[in-house]
């Protein structure tokens, strides 16, 4: 069975209730490929999660942008996986490069978070990616492999994991990895998973691309054999997010 195309929209720390309502209305009215062609998940800030979930069309789903590494308790400011499950939130994004950089989240911490979220019944979009310095030093694959290894060491079942490759140098910069550059990393990452986790997982796990994806470049990126979708930042707040969702048809044509 082929890997179903996956498009995630990461709204990051953006939006007012009026803006959020506008985006949701736009998505609800959009004509996009059916659920059997593309899986669509949007990730608003915590405060808007129930609002978006209640308003959003039934064939789209919501994700939190983070959750705590273990059971809730005396962890001021954190949100636990159990709380998300209680609210009926099916997905969570973990290990985003902004959190790795700004909040010093280590590979091991992201691995622990992923394992705990999965154990509570959440599905995980697990982010990996290299900085510009790491790319220029020729260590892209080793960096991405180390990030993935930290997850593989804690997780045995990959059914509910989507891996998002986001080169840090391409996030919000307007620079985008060329389709060939992105495909190369996706191919190498899938190969690493095959050799270190198993051929079944490598064949079925979706590896999506993030990093300045927009309506103009999404079709060409979607045409690459190892790119199974996108994690979209800035463009997920704009009408062009609909065009990115439509790029899923490249796979089914």
Curated annotation (Swiss-Prot):
<dbReference type="GO" id="GO:0046166">
    <property type="term" value="P:glyceraldehyde-3-phosphate biosynthetic process"/>
</dbReference>
<comment type="subunit">
    <text>Homodimer.</text>
</comment>
<dbReference type="GO" id="GO:0019563">
    <property type="term" value="P:glycerol catabolic process"/>
</dbReference>
<feature type="active site" description="Proton acceptor">
    <location>
        <position position="166"/>
    </location>
</feature>
<dbReference type="InterPro" id="IPR000652">
    <property type="entry name" value="Triosephosphate_isomerase"/>
</dbReference>
<dbReference type="InterPro" id="IPR035990">
    <property type="entry name" value="TIM_sf"/>
</dbReference>
<comment type="pathway">
    <text>Carbohydrate degradation; glycolysis; D-glyceraldehyde 3-phosphate from glycerone phosphate: step 1/1.</text>
</comment>
<comment type="similarity">
    <text>Belongs to the triosephosphate isomerase family.</text>
</comment>
<keyword id="KW-0413">Isomerase</keyword>
<dbReference type="GO" id="GO:0004807">
    <property type="term" value="F:triose-phosphate isomerase activity"/>
</dbReference>
<protein>
    <recommendedName>
        <fullName>Triosephosphate isomerase, cytosolic</fullName>
        <ecNumber>5.3.1.1</ecNumber>
    </recommendedName>
</protein>
<comment type="pathway">
    <text>Carbohydrate biosynthesis; gluconeogenesis.</text>
</comment>
<feature type="binding site">
    <location>
        <position position="12"/>
    </location>
    <ligand>
        <name>substrate</name>
    </ligand>
</feature>
<dbReference type="GO" id="GO:0005829">
    <property type="term" value="C:cytosol"/>
</dbReference>
<keyword id="KW-0312">Gluconeogenesis</keyword>
<feature type="active site" description="Electrophile">
    <location>
        <position position="96"/>
    </location>
</feature>
<dbReference type="InterPro" id="IPR013785">
    <property type="entry name" value="Aldolase_TIM"/>
</dbReference>
<keyword id="KW-0963">Cytoplasm</keyword>
<dbReference type="GO" id="GO:0006096">
    <property type="term" value="P:glycolytic process"/>
</dbReference>
<keyword id="KW-0324">Glycolysis</keyword>
<dbReference type="Pfam" id="PF00121">
    <property type="entry name" value="TIM"/>
</dbReference>
<feature type="binding site">
    <location>
        <position position="10"/>
    </location>
    <ligand>
        <name>substrate</name>
    </ligand>
</feature>
<dbReference type="GO" id="GO:0006094">
    <property type="term" value="P:gluconeogenesis"/>
</dbReference>
<dbReference type="InterPro" id="IPR022896">
    <property type="entry name" value="TrioseP_Isoase_bac/euk"/>
</dbReference>
<dbReference type="InterPro" id="IPR020861">
    <property type="entry name" value="Triosephosphate_isomerase_AS"/>
</dbReference>
């Amino acid at each position: 069975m082929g890997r179903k195309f996956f498009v995630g929209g990461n709204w990051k720390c953006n939006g007012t209730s009026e803006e959020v309502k506008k985006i949701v209305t736009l998505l609800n009215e959009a004509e996009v490929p059916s659920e059997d062609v593309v899986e669509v998940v949007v990730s608003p800030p915590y405060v808007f999660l129930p609002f978006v979930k209640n308003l959003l069309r039934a064939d789209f789903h919501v994700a939190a942008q983070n959750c705590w590494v273990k059971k809730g308790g005396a962890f001021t400011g954190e949100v636990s996986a159990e709380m998300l499950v209680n609210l009926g939130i099916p997905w969570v994004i973990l290990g985003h490069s902004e959190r790795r950089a700004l909040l010093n989240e280590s590979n091991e911490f992201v691995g622990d978070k992923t394992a705990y979220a999965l154990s509570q019944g959440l599905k995980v979009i697990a982010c990996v990616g290299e900085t510009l310095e790491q790319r220029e030093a020729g260590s892209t694959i080793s960096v991405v492999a180390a990030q993935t290894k930290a997850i593989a060491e804690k997780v045995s079942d990959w059914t509910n994991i989507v891996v998002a490759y986001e080169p840090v140098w391409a996030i919000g910069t307007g620079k985008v990895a060329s389709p060939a550059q992105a495909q190369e990393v996706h191919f190498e990452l899938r190969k690493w998973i095959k050799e270190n986790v198993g051929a079944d997982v490598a064949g079925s796990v979706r590896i999506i691309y993030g990093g300045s994806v927009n309506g103009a470049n999404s079709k060409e990126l979607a045409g690459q054999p190892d790119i199974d979708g996108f994690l979209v930042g800035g463009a997920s707040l704009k009408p062009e997010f609909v065009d990115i969702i439509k790029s899923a048809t490249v796979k089914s044509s």
